[in-house]
């Protein structure tokens, strides 16, 4: 009797389309107004404040302060994750995290970082590149006190980026902390948790335009605290 060969078995199994969409034809035509050099603010932080206000009030964004933070380890291997921006001013852009997390360990070894704000509904994005430094403990504590009680407990319960046995282990750690620090009781600031301030050396503002001829204007830091503006080809 003739058996079924591996080739016959393989051919009998229907092959699913790995991509059920025609990605090559998926595109949008941007029709937003452009961005010119004459419209820019004197500093990138002022310009960011303008755009952020629009993103937060008129942009239709769920979390306008969500940004993609990209870091690299000492061997140059990159990693990215979404983090919430919690403060910005002329001194830089601030976010908070577990200092034992992958991103924090990579920033301690290699402080060069990129922040990407993907404001897709507005056909805009902002890319900040610079150097990250830890914030002071007083600044960290002041922000920690503004967090919801549950988020404060979560900062203790999660050993961020470590392997956890299962969800029950994580929930169990949280439950123990909730019993120790019930609602209304002050939760101490974890020593392994705090902020990073990204001091920018370049900030690019991207505005989508028709025919993929987008506007890309980049502020580049110069000596003495000044900035020059460059237009980049799209």
Swiss-Prot record:
Residue positions binding substrate: 27-30, 86, 143, 147, 151, 212-214
Keywords from the named record: Flavoprotein, FMN, Oxidoreductase, Pyridoxine biosynthesis
Cofactor(s) needed: FMN
HAMAP family: PdxH (MF_01629)
Cofactor remark from the record: Binds 1 FMN per subunit.
Family: Belongs to the pyridoxamine 5'-phosphate oxidase family.
Task of the protein: Catalyzes the oxidation of either pyridoxine 5'-phosphate (PNP) or pyridoxamine 5'-phosphate (PMP) into pyridoxal 5'-phosphate (PLP).
Pathway(s) annotated for this protein in UniProt: Cofactor metabolism; pyridoxal 5'-phosphate salvage; pyridoxal 5'-phosphate from pyridoxamine 5'-phosphate: step 1/1; Cofactor metabolism; pyridoxal 5'-phosphate salvage; pyridoxal 5'-phosphate from pyridoxine 5'-phosphate: step 1/1
Catalytic activity from the UniProt record: pyridoxamine 5'-phosphate + O2 + H2O = pyridoxal 5'-phosphate + H2O2 + NH4(+); pyridoxine 5'-phosphate + O2 = pyridoxal 5'-phosphate + H2O2
Binding site for FMN: 81-86, 96-97, 102-103, 125, 160-161, 206, 216
Gene that encodes the chain: pdxH
Protein name: Pyridoxine/pyridoxamine 5'-phosphate oxidase
Gene Ontology MF term list: FMN binding; pyridoxamine phosphate oxidase activity
Entry EC no(s): 1.4.3.5
Quaternary structure and partners: Homodimer.
Source species: Streptomyces coelicolor (strain ATCC BAA-471 / A3(2) / M145)
Xref: InterPro entries: Pyridox_Oxase, Pyridox_Oxase_CS, Pyridox_Oxase_N, Pyridoxamine_oxidase_dimer_C, Split_barrel_FMN-bd
Gene Ontology BP annotations: pyridoxine biosynthetic process
Catalytic class of the enzyme: oxidoreductase
């Amino acid at each position: 009797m003739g058996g079924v060969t591996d080739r016959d078995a393989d051919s009998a199994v229907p092959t699913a389309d790995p991509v059920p969409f025609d990605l090559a034809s998926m595109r949008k035509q941007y029709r937003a107004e452009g961005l010119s050099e004459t419209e820019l603010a004197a500093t990138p932080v002022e310009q960011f404040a303008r755009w952020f206000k629009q993103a937060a009030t008129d942009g239709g964004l769920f979390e306008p302060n969500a940004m993609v933070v990209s870091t690299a380890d000492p061997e140059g291997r990159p990693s990215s994750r979404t983090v919430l921006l919690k403060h910005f001013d002329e001194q830089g852009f601030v976010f908070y995290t577990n200092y034992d997390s992958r991103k924090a360990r990579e920033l301690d070894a290699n402080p060069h970082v990129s922040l990407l704000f993907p404001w897709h509904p507005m056909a805009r994005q902002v890319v900040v590149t610079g150097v990250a430094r830890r914030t002071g403990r007083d600044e960290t504590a002041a922000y920690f006190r503004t967090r919801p009680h549950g988020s404060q407990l979560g900062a203790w319960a999660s050993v961020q980026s470590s392997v956890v046995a299962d969800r029950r282990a994580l929930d169990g750690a949280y439950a123990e902390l909730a019993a120790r620090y019930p609602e209304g009781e002050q939760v101490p600031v974890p020593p392994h948790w705090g902020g990073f301030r990204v001091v920018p050396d370049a900030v690019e503002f991207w505005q989508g335009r028709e025919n993929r001829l987008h506007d890309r204007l980049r502020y580049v830091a110069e000596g003495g605290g000044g900035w020059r503006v460059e237009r980049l080809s799209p």
